[in-house]
Amino acid sequence: MEQSNKQHRKAKEKNTAKKKLHTQGHNAKAFAVAAPGKMARTMQRSSDVNERKLHVPMVDRTPEDDPPPFIVAVVGPPGTGKTTLIRSLVRRMTKSTLNDIQGPITVVSGKHRRLTFLECPADDLNAMIDIAKIADLVLLLIDGNFGFEMETMEFLNIAQHHGMPRVLGVATHLDLFKSQSTLRASKKRLKHRFWTEVYQGAKLFYLSGVINGRYPDREILNLSRFISVMKFRPLKWRNEHPYMLADRFTDLTHPELIETQGLQIDRKVAIYGYLHGTPLPSAPGTRVHIAGVGDFSVAQIEKLPDPCPTPFYQQKLDDFEREKMKEEAKANGEITTASTTRRRKRLDDKDKLIYAPMSDVGGVLMDKDAVYIDIGKKNEEPSFVPGQERGEGEKLMTGLQSVEQSIAEKFDGVGLQLFSNGTELHEVADHEGMDVESGEESIEDDEGKSKGRTSLRKPRIYGKPVQEEDADIDNLPSDEEPYTNDDDVQDSEPRMVEIDFNNTGEQGAEKLALETDSEFEESEDEFSWERTAANKLKKTESKKRTWNIGKLIYMDNISPEECIRRWRGEDDDSKDESDIEEDVDDDFFRKKDGTVTKEGNKDHAVDLEKFVPYFDTFEKLAKKWKSVDAIKERFLGAGILGNDNKTKSDSNEGGEELYGDFEDLEDGNPSEQAEDNSDKESEDEDENEDTNGDDDNSFTNFDAEEKKDLTMEQEREMNAAKKEKLRAQFEIEEGENFKEDDENNEYDTWYELQKAKISKQLEINNIEYQEMTPEQRQRIEGFKAGSYVRIVFEKVPMEFVKNFNPKFPIVMGGLLPTEIKFGIVKARLRRHRWHKKILKTNDPLVLSLGWRRFQTLPIYTTTDSRTRTRMLKYTPEHTYCNAAFYGPLCSPNTPFCGVQIVANSDTGNGFRIAATGIVEEIDVNIEIVKKLKLVGFPYKIFKNTAFIKDMFSSAMEVARFEGAQIKTVSGIRGEIKRALSKPEGHYRAAFEDKILMSDIVILRSWYPVRVKKFYNPVTSLLLKEKTEWKGLRLTGQIRAAMNLETPSNPDSAYHKIERVERHFNGLKVPKAVQKELPFKSQIHQMKPQKKKTYMAKRAVVLGGDEKKARSFIQKVLTISKAKDSKRKEQKASQRKERLKKLAKMEEEKSQRDKEKKKEYFAQNGKRTTMGGDDESRPRKMRR
């Protein structure tokens, strides 16, 4: 029989259950938390994650429009596949194959991102230290088949103390595992060990075998994607200093100097690279440090076109050009067809640029001597056949190669054609006969080049074109920009000009400065038409015109004398040579009538040039130098001096005529300004009177109150106000009690408030910078990060050029003003727990502090209850100590690490990082002392006085220590009185008790220890073998190298201590004293026996079997007693339990008796009556 099932019927109303649930309102209990514990754990985890994301707010100074490329360092032991990994990543990002990888390699990895790959030499500790300071991302390669090696752990510890960049682990050689289970176990072990060193959850990639010289494409794709989206946080040291990784360098030394002076002369070197960190000052003379070379001053710095721009930057340039074309077409009334650029979704192949000047990119290799082009092998098919050129490039090359005449033959008989319709000139006769001595006709610059004609030629007048707009001085190209042919063509064409002879304002002054002192003065006449027109304008210009001194002093193409001359309105002809040599500083001050004060110039300036002193004695000169009031009025205006100078002006009515009344040249009406200043002074006086009259508010001005004579209560109130102000400031800075004072604050947390402040300040700075011209911004801000620059250094050692190796990085770091100075640095230091030996004071130690690597002699110290700084001979175990060393100053809280050996030949199998620490104080006058014990012996003893010898060698030394505290070994304290006359070095001392001849007298003293001023920079890049730098060696190492024995001091040798046994005589009491003693205290002594007594003769001495038997019986009795005591204890415990049980039974029995009595009296009490005795007495109960 077939089974029949009931058909399912769907519910007609789906929300019926929900309607029934909410008929009586919302039921809160129905929606309670199902698992409160799980919810609490989830909230705790969310809070922990949010707290781990918080960091100290820091200013990110990286420019957003064109950031510098991120430095990706590939680090690992030898043979782990560093070169293969770089080759694979470059192939993935640029589709270019590199055969010889040397130096930095910059590639475009995204629309806004570039990467600079750098391979770290595996065997050079110096390169590891330098790369750890500049790397943004570290690809740490690990041999998965072998495990972690010493170089890996050393680099991680170095990076931890230099900012700790982002670290990605890459495990290689995993194809050598045959078993999958072993591979999984090895991966797990490597991952957890890597997490221990970096952080929990650090990413570790796995790369299998190599295919065709590269890693598998899928694995490299995953790694490159992870690198491209990684975010980097600014590090403190890099956020405060400019630095650069040089990608190439050039020797600019003139070959003639090398030939004449020899190969050992210092060189002029230019290095190229991208700037990172903060902006680098554009002024020459900026101090920088090249790691491995030394400190240098920047001789010249120039910004170059970016050799590897990002697509975003290129798109901005294209948009700028397109907008410019639109504006020009709109001005001409044309319709433009220029369209906007579409949004990029992916990189085109043409945008995947690569820049590696020291590697063989595209068959071109740039070396320090030449540029090498790979032309292929001989057995390959030739890519070029003469006569069968395939393009313009090949035609150009064949044209250059087919030389029929030499250079001398080509230029033989060739003349100079100045104009297109002119004839060639072979000779030029000197018709003008220029006088060498005249300053107008022959003016030469420092390099010996003539500046050309100074007078205006009459036939033609060339100047500024009419159709062009007025140019500003900031629109001129700088001296550092390269010269192009387009400018050549434009400047060579004659153009009509418009000359305004009536313009005498500031704008006209700017034009004159543009036309007379531009960079075209040093060029030839055909490029200097603006200068010639300006010379004519300069003669017709009014001398009374006021120049803008604020713009004149920033013109770098004129001298200070020219700046003063223009500001004073003088002409070249009216100024003789004596006026040029006058002191420039006195010319900055003018009287109201427009004349320059000549008091100081007339009397003293000429004498100073002749080196003739105008003071009779040195005392007069010192008095004049210390007199501040004599020159105070020269630098401060009347409104600034205030009330203090009113009495002086009243007492001396001629003071205005004596010192002159100065005017502000940038202000149009100085008299109105003086009136405004006087009004402001009166207002300030009224405010000060009101403030002083109010006693409650007077304590807020702490600086003014400290100068007054305050009572004790007023001082307490002022100190309390100071403390309250400091407490409030501390709470604001630390974020405590946030939102209590200001409840309407729009920020939820203090962290968001600080980030908003930083972003607001950055926005204000950017607005100010955008209002400036590019030249002004570069002068004030410097070359910002992301700029590709060329920096020239002079006096570089020739070994740097001779022994250059592109495999070792060249790192240039900028120095702050504090870091240029040298002094004593106090730091907190600890020996690394993996280093084998403890460190000894004054042993040389190579420190990596800031950009520098240098060798110094540290002294390890500790503090004794904050009273003295005591020297330690060795570093303590597992704890920090203080260290003082001489070296370059660095800001406090700067971490550093130290190593003892950097040469590979002296390195063993141990861990090389010897110490780590942090700077606490700089340039301190630290007083370090060490303990010194002087030992003496008494040779004459009186009651409380003794004569001591063998402690000092002369009476002078004793006089130095008069009054010093001394002490004996037995603890008797004393004091040094004075020296004795006859035995030299002996002295008299007083003690608190009589001492013995056997006592040793000790003087505890503290001897000052000075830090040795030893600074030896690690110049590893100057060596041919970069890994073999050896600094100051230890004495033991020198003796071992020279095969010398260690000299032995007999006093320092250890001997067996043989102490003489002391015999003490018995106490003898006189008989007269014994007779006076009471009977109880008398001394009872037996007289010595002449013969043996009975007890001595009959003494029982056990031996043999009897002794064994007695000892056996004793043991048996001991065991029996132990058993009896144990049995007694057991019986006592049983008796105790039985008594407890009996007490419980007795209690139960008494409880039953009570209940029976209660029940009996309750029943029989009803039968009694109030009357008769018979009825009141109870009846006898039957038995």
Swiss-Prot record:
* One Pfam family here: AAA
Q: Where is this region: G4?
A: 172-175
Asked if Transferase is a keyword of the record, the answer is no
Which residues does the record list as Phosphothreonine (modified residue)? 504, 516
Q: Which reaction does it catalyse?
A: GTP + H2O = GDP + phosphate + H(+)
Q: Where in the cell is it found?
A: Cytoplasm; Nucleus, Nucleolus
GO MF annotation: an example: GTPase activity
Instruction: Provide the binding site for ATP.
Output: 76-83
The entry's function note states: GTPase required for synthesis of 40S ribosomal subunits and for processing the 35S pre-rRNA at sites A0, A1, and A2. Controls access of pre-ribosomal RNA intermediates to RCL1 during ribosome biogenesis by binding of RCL1 in a GTP-dependent manner and, via its affinity to U3 snoRNA, delivering it to pre-ribosomes. GTP-binding and/or GTP hydrolysis may induce conformational rearrangements within the BMS1-RCL1 complex allowing the interaction of RCL1 with its RNA substrate. Required for RCL1 import into the nucleus.
Please report which protein family the annotation says this sequence is part of.
Answer: Belongs to the TRAFAC class translation factor GTPase superfamily. Bms1-like GTPase family. BMS1 subfamily.
Protein name, as recorded: Ribosome biogenesis protein BMS1
Which gene holds the coding sequence for this protein?
Answer: BMS1
